[in-house]
């Protein structure tokens, strides 16, 4: 077979293989096979050197013509493949405008956080300053300095989470009161928000973790009337309606006298499920700071008096929004939470 015939056969074989190429990688492999340093045209170069001198010019021209043809076909095929690949990529990224839009779900404050912020803001407007204390507290600050007897039930492990013999997860934010009273002399007017922990059975009305706000005021001649006036203003602002206040005698180790605070229900006494048909909602525990608590902090109870009030934030949220189960606050159910966003 002459070189001319070999070139023609090579061209035909190339065209067959070129038609089967569908990717840039396959085209590159084909180019290397024909035009690479060890490709088919390397053989033609070797044969050209062995060709008689009078035929070299003609054979050289034929080889170059065939090589040029193959190079042009490869360029055209490459352009075609690139265009096809770009079109495929474009179609892949194309937005289907017939698809339904994706709804965005913006975040928002948790209902407990919203109520907590509202409560703290009201107390700030009433002249209180915000103070905080650790969630992990000594038994002394959590109980002893607040006038809890050694055998008080609240000290037992079935009511309190003990980390060791003398360290607990605080059961109330009253530990802030102990720390603030020991810092200096009155007047002291503080609101203390934070988490509390109690070893209780989880139910619709109680949980092992909850938020509490304690507010206390210590100065000369502070009376129970001052407490009543402050509470009336606070709950009127919080519930955004005029309320009546009812105080019931109760016992708390750190106050004397101790009182339970009720506010009039929105049903105006006609009775509803929220107030259990009593016309009243229990909202807080309060009282005048016990003289022994003041002595424990180095303050003379003959000179200074003060009041303290503690309220559960989840309880306030439940009363304000008619929520019947405290467990809902911890379940992260968007159907519930989005009602208050």
UniProtKB/Swiss-Prot annotation:
One of its GO terms (biological process) is phenylalanyl-tRNA aminoacylation. Its cofactor is Mg(2+). SUPFAM superfamilies: Class II aaRS and biotin synthetases, tRNA-binding arm. Disulfide bonds: none annotated. This is Phenylalanine--tRNA ligase alpha subunit. It comes from Chlamydia felis (strain Fe/C-56). It is found in: Cytoplasm. GO terms for molecular function: ATP binding; magnesium ion binding; phenylalanine-tRNA ligase activity; tRNA binding. It catalyses: tRNA(Phe) + L-phenylalanine + ATP = L-phenylalanyl-tRNA(Phe) + AMP + diphosphate + H(+). Mg(2+) binds at residue 256.
